[in-house]
A protein has these predicted regions:
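C-terminal and inter-domain tail/linker signature
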Residues: 2-158
Length: 158
């Protein structure tokens, strides 16, 4: 497997000097297939996420650190490359958001999407993480038959 890494500068907190955002960026710079299933993965997650983390995206709802660790192990298991580029962040008190672009390579797919992560912290750890992105553009539109159907539906709706 190729190295799957984020290439954005993990210290790029130009929109905010909040160290919690810096830690979030650093985490996604560190995660890779090489960290999946290792103690390092757990340690990295524990530096950013609360033990009672509630994590969601358009395809998953996860509660707790153990489930989050399994999610990341599965996520990085089949990819050969991943890159998160962080564009800007906003923080006020214990809530924040991060705008990002993700690109990845899977043995059968090469895709990416833009998204936003909504964050809520408790004791400086992320207790709620919600990713918002177009799941179709990330996955379904790249599958042969389903992708063609989605493309045709979008054409008709335009």
């Amino acid at each position: 497997m190729d190295n799957a890494r984020t290439t954005s500068d993990p210290a790029n907190t130009e929109q905010t000097n909040d160290p919690r955002i810096g830690a979030f960026y650093k985490l996604y710079h560190t995660l890779s297939p090489e960290t999946a299933g290792t103690e390092k993965l757990r340690r990295c997650l524990e530096q950013v996420y609360h033990p009672d983390i509630a994590f969601s995206d358009p395809m998953h709802r996860i509660t707790g650190m153990d489930a989050l660790e399994k999610y990341f192990e599965g996520l990085y298991e089949n990819i050969t490359y991943i890159d998160f580029q962080f564009h800007n962040a906003w923080v006020e008190s214990d809530t924040g958001s991060v705008h990002w672009t993700m690109r990845y390579r899977h043995p059968r797919l090469k895709a990416g999407t833009d998204g936003v992560t909504l964050l809520r912290w408790e004791n400086n750890l992320v207790v709620q993480h919600q990713d918002i992105f177009d799941a179709g553009s990330l996955l379904y539109e790249h599958l042969p038959v389903i992708g063609w159907l989605i493309h045709k539906l979008k054409e008709r709706m335009a």
